[in-house]
Amino acid sequence: MQSGLMGELLELTLEHVGLVSVAMAIATAMAIPAGILLTRREALRRWVLGFANIMQTVPSLALFGFLIPLPFIGGIGKHTAIVALVLYALLPILQNTLAGIVGVDRAVRESAIAMGMTGRQLLWLVELPLAARTILAGVRVATVITIGTATIAAAIGGGGLGVFIFRGLASVDTKQILAGAVPAALIALAADKGLSWVEQKFWRG
């Protein structure tokens, strides 16, 4: 019985990490280019950031429920869970990408242009390297948020460690709740510390 529980814990932990990894990969691939675009199109900033802010204010369970009826997402299951997690992860990465690039010293930017750099070269060789630490900080925040929010995925059949939590709530079983909550918290802590280490390793001072 004990080995069966450990096996299920391992399976749900891997499932949880998988949900978070896919959602973060999609969110990062969307938010960084969008953040770059917003540095070039100021008129879009209010609308795009406004949408991302709205997604953050919607209660997580409500957002999961709202997405279920949408036919192009896929109803109950992992697809809907991933879409919801992506929407929650967008804002920190988007904001930090924008802040990082906009925050590049104007003198540095002007020097690069004076050297004959094109807009593309300026972005790839100057702005993104200087903004990378800020962008990574946004990814770190989004990752921790996503790990916690992913526990709600079990409510719509998305799996993950939330399965233990919801099962424990239904049966008033504290051990089941802790079996889901503690590993999720440890994963979030490990992700935060790991990304923080990367940040300090490559951008000391």
Model-derived features with residue positions:
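Short, membrane-interfacial amphipathic segments enriched in basic
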Residues: 1-7, 37-38, 121-124
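Transmembrane alpha-helix signature in integral membrane proteins
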Residues: 9-37
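Cytoplasmic-entry segments and transmembrane alpha-helices of multi-pass inner-membrane transporters
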Residues: 11, 34-67, 85, 95-99
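Loop-to-helix entry region at the N-terminal start of transmembrane alpha-helices
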Residues: 11-19, 66-92, 131-132, 176, ...
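Transmembrane alpha-helices
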Residues: 21, 120-152, 178-179, 184, ...
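C-terminal transmembrane helix and the adjacent membrane-cytosol boundary/short C-terminal tail
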Residues: 42, 98-102, 106, 114, ...
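Glycine-rich helix-loop "coupling/hinge" segments at transmembrane-helix boundaries
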Residues: 69, 149-184, 203
